[in-house]
Amino acid sequence: MNNPQYMSGTGNNFLVSEYENSKTDIEIISIVADSLFDIDGVIYVEKIDSLTVKMHYYNNDGSTAELCVNGIRCVAKYALDNSIVDSNEVTVVAPIGNIKTNIKENTVSIEVSTPTYEKNKLLIDGLECIKSNIGNPHLLVEVDNVYKFDL
């Protein structure tokens, strides 16, 4: 890994590194994710041009995802902090498409598509759930008090 850094984005923890044009070893990613910092994923940042980077994202089990919003925020910050890009407006290329970001000090804002929602509710363990998608699937559950709900 080239210049690896531990980064956190709104509760998700990542190991972020510059992309090395080599085959990714899924087994190593799983070992690193399990043993290092209890991270959610490993992200490689590949320079495309002075305003654009490509994100190579791997979950902690070695699988990939089309979109990881918190990971994209970390990628943009990493790219700016490590002079991979030369602007605080960074485009991150992800499997879902190009995501525009804007960095102001330690805050990274992103533009994502409008979420889609399925109209039919699911009943899971007695809870009404709704499927949503912002590039990757989510399951939404409304509770009276999130702080008292046993996650």
PLM features per residue range, with description:
Residues 106-112:
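Short, solvent-exposed secondary-structure boundary/capping segments
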